[in-house]
């Protein structure tokens, strides 16, 4: 550094430094970050999280149904903590009890801020599929995943991520009458979606929250994915019991989900066991982690 100063002179160096700083300030003033999308990065600025959480609180607490959702978010650890922790890694093992149904078992890392995900087979680490936020892809042979990976990419998040996944745009909330479940009074909120929201906007969820703690106890839902129901319609409603909640870096998440057919608003025949394990928030990932890898096939 001393040698450099001797070469160019102290005055010239100071002029250059000041000019660079002024140019940097000018450039920074002209660049306004998008507060909702981070391209090719897993790190979310704290100010963006604060802004998104503030807007979510204002929107949700403006209605009685939204207030229940907000209170549940707080009870489960808070929307800010959910986003601050970064992408969530977990093994999601979906095990139908019916013999003709396909098990879906993968380790995934999902980015709830941008709805991006990468799944890896639990038996072949080279077999992967995912969603970039825009493109669904797969990199595996034809036998690795015997199910619709495009449909399944973000499905686990929407089965286990309530109430946090209700913060987005296009979400409609309706407060239904209280109901009794497992001898407890529950607050009940129905979630629907605007047309054009996601691949299956006709889906709905009916969420049962403990009226005292606001922790999620059960989820009723339908599947209306157009590739499965080309003429419209949906499957019969399912009733999903929420099992033990575990603390993952300050966020309470389910380790077990038990799915039944719904009968008169309550659980009927038990049809699917879902075990969620190895949950951890992953703070350090390559910037291109959620991009479609070389050699992958676009779905």
What are the functions of these language-model segments?
Residues 85-87, 168, 184, 252:
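Extracytoplasmic
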Residues 13-14, 25-54:
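Compositionally biased, proline/threonine/alanine/serine-rich low-complexity intrinsically disordered stretches
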Residues 61-65, 130-203, 227-233, 285, ...:
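Flexible, processing/modification-adjacent segments and terminal tails
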Residues 34-37, 51-144, 172-180:
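N-terminal mature ectodomain segment of secretory-pathway/periplasmic proteins
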Residues 21-23:
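Bacterial signal peptide processing site
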Residues 1-9:
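Bacterial N-terminal signal peptides that target proteins for export
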Residues 186-291:
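Gly/Pro-enriched, hydrophobic low-complexity segments
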Residues 16-19:
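C-terminal motif of bacterial Sec signal peptides marking the signal peptidase cleavage site
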């Amino acid at each position: 550094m001393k040698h450099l100063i001797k070469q160019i002179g102290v005055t010239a160096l100071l002029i250059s430094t000041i000019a660079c700083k002024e140019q940097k300030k000018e450039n920074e003033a002209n660049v306004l970050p998008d507060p909702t999308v981070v391209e090719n990065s897993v790190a979310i600025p704290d100010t963006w999280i604060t802004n998104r959480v503030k807007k979510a609180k204002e929107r949700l607490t403006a209605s009685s149904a939204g207030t229940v959702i907000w209170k549940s978010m707080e009870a489960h650890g808070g929307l800010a903590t959910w986003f601050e922790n970064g992408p969530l890694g977990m093994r999601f093992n979906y095990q139908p009890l019916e013999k003709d149904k396909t098990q879906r078992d993968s380790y995934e890392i999902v980015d709830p801020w941008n709805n991006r995900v990468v799944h890896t087979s639990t038996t072949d680490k080279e077999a992967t599929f995912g969603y970039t936020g825009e493109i669904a892809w797969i990199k595996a042979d034809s036998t690795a995943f015997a199910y619709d990976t495009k449909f399944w990419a973000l499905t686990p998040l929407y089965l286990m991520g309530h109430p946090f996944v209700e913060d987005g745009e296009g979400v409609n909330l309706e407060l239904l009458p209280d109901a009794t479940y497992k001898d407890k009074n529950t607050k009940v909120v129905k979630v629907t979606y605007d047309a054009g929201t996601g691949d299956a906007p006709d889906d709905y969820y009916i969420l049962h929250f403990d009226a005292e703690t606001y922790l999620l106890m059960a989820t009723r839902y339908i599947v209306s994915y157009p590739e499965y129901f080309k003429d419209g319609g949906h499957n019969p409603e399912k009733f999903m019991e929420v099992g033990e909640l575990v603390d993952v870096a300050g966020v309470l998440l389910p380790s077990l989900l038990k799915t039944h057919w719904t009968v008169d608003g309550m659980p009927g025949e038990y049809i699917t066991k879902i075990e969620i394990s190895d949950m951890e928030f992953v703070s350090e990932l390559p910037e291109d982690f959620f991009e479609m890898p070389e050699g992958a096939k676009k779905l």
